[in-house]
């Protein structure tokens, strides 16, 4: 049971003493009501709280907040403050609190960003909550009275597991809400209410910036237990048609029933992305997203390569054919690097090599250690293993992952899970041997490294010996 932080209650009491009222809003209230409907006691955990304050002008609110910790102004025109409590780094410290005035939105231009937003402490609760996206996100909680205020039927929609627009006239003004419907449908495992479906399908999405599209897709991939639910709703709500032609091409693309009894490439991709979610445990966010994106993109080459050959459905060389559409898909969301990790290039390489574990296994008697070490120069074999498992298990029927387990076993034996071996011979070693600076240093170190990858060079002594032999050959050839 998670109690409300004492500081939060003290803050609400201080607002009340000044003649105002403070209410918790947003996802925390939704999660609280979901817990209550499930018969769970206590409050949901929160890394951060969203507090909306009525009846106090911005200057008085800022002064009051300063008594409780460091106050940062996040949005000046609509008075949003981030309160970082004193001693926030200590044990049991209260989480940060985003504090805002009720907002009055005025549509002044087309598109997602075409709003003029002003904080208005005199706004009624009904008018303030009217601007929210879905009824389940429009509830408020009074921490002092312990009561939830539900003006739009959010509790009923929670019970029915529905996402319903609060106000159709304001809902359609913000195109991002269509993508929020996509990610919330998967995170909550809710259906979208039919009238809201029609609203979403009629909204133009061309104004959405790449970073906002990615922001919602990232939440879908990381926070949903079954991301396929969101991808399915993305198709139903028109998002796939409008934003992701690479996904649209998967729909109706046939596959050989012997290997894919589940159906077309779209159905396989939905199953595979849910399996991928089970494969990313323990990975940092950037690598988890890399695996999820690679699985979404892994069969992008099938629509252009699928053909009927001798009575069977084939898609020869679809791995390489998927590279260009994968790049286009990633570019549409401006996916590049995350935390210094090149997500884009790693995803592309995983798409291009997603069948490699199976190919290596089929030819295991002829695949040497060098093949694994060289593969690790292009991508992370551990991530490839996870992508390949998701591909294999993202089907109906009983399919073995023997190839994938053999592959990762070899990878671990060679210690190339995330990178190739470090070169044994460096340029400084050749300089120590008396070789002058010049292009010969790069040529010889590269040649020695290739031998190292094949296992023919195992230590520095062998590397130096081979370097001397190559130098002697050069002298003979140039004399």
Set out the residue ranges of the language-model regions.
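Catalytic cores of the polymerase beta-like nucleotidyltransferase superfamily
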Residues: 1-479
